[in-house]
Amino acid sequence: MGANTFGKLLAVTTFGESHGPAIGCVIDGCPPGLELAAEEFAHDLQRRATGRSRHTSARREADEVEILSGVYEGRTTGTPIALLIRNTDQRSKDYATIVRQFRPGHADYTYWQKYGIRDPRGGGRSSARETTMRVTAGVVAKKWLKQRYGVIVRGFLSQLGEIRPEGFAWDAIEDNPFFWPHAAQVPALEAYMDALRKSGNSVGARVGVVAEGVPPGWGEPIYGKLDGELAAALMSINAVKGVEIGAGFGSAVQKGTEHRDLMTPLGFLSNHAGGIIGGIATGQPIIVSIALKPTSSLRLPGETVDVDGCAVQVITKGRHDPCVGIRAPPIAEAMVALVLMDQALRHRAQCGDVGEMSPCIPEGVGLRNADD
């Protein structure tokens, strides 16, 4: 299996399966001198973890990070950082009935067609368990970005089924299990998810990520576009079926006079571009959004085929999320941060000595944003 590494100057490789003995990652290219301790990973891993809410999978993993290399006396050395998390709460017997069946909407069929073999236990390599290591690597990237450039990357749930936020406050997001930006709606979300779980069905969601403080100039034209690499990174997350940058697909119905982000000495008057023009950061907040499909792991019967091509009925047992989007904000944050750190290192390598050619336009006066 190839394509387990992404990034150029900052390269991240993940390994391991959902029900294997461990999962891990190697971060290559992190500059030396960054203070790093194993306990720093706990916060974001808890945010991503299952079993902390009745609205997510009941699987409970300790997610304790072991730093195997790349850190000496509490600081990164510039050599590859190897991180390991041991799996402790696998329940492989739940998957005994689907060893020879293909679950509709899962990677069972495509992995079988590509490799001629698959690990049916929890989805193996295709499981969202792999994203644990993305979040772990993202902790390193977010810390480096904040310390070096003051960049802050934050995510939130922007839609659950047909429900959208009726207000927005960053302070509310970490105070509920949905990463929801409007506290008054949380009881309604709880009731919605309780009913969904009882029905045995699942639902999709949208997640938004905002990166603030990104300097103008990060990114590359044509084949190394910042928005292109963000889109690729976010599309690599399990269940993601769409990515928007700024106004995204809403741009299709806008007039040019609506979409263009006018500039004044005080800053940009809007941010429909989502902070990126020509593949290069403008200095405004970078705004991205992803759509996640409903999980196909359902206890409702459905038609499928087995490895012999025979028609069968499938019912997925085990512990599964009724909405995978609920745990996705920390994962999306991590992918955005890793792309930004890689782009920052590449920009510094090529254009670190380039001075300002013209006055740098401030972020803007906040009259309009990509969601208007």
From Swiss-Prot:
Gene: aroC
Listed name of the protein: Chorismate synthase
Family to which this protein belongs: Belongs to the chorismate synthase family.
Signal peptide coordinates: none
Oligomeric and partner information: Homotetramer.
CC terms in the record's Gene Ontology section: cytosol
Keywords, in A-Z order: Amino-acid biosynthesis, Aromatic amino acid biosynthesis, FAD, Flavoprotein, FMN, Lyase, NADP
UniProt cross-references to SUPFAM superfamilies, sorted A to Z: Chorismate synthase, AroC
Recorded catalytic activity of this chain's protein: 5-O-(1-carboxyvinyl)-3-phosphoshikimate = chorismate + phosphate
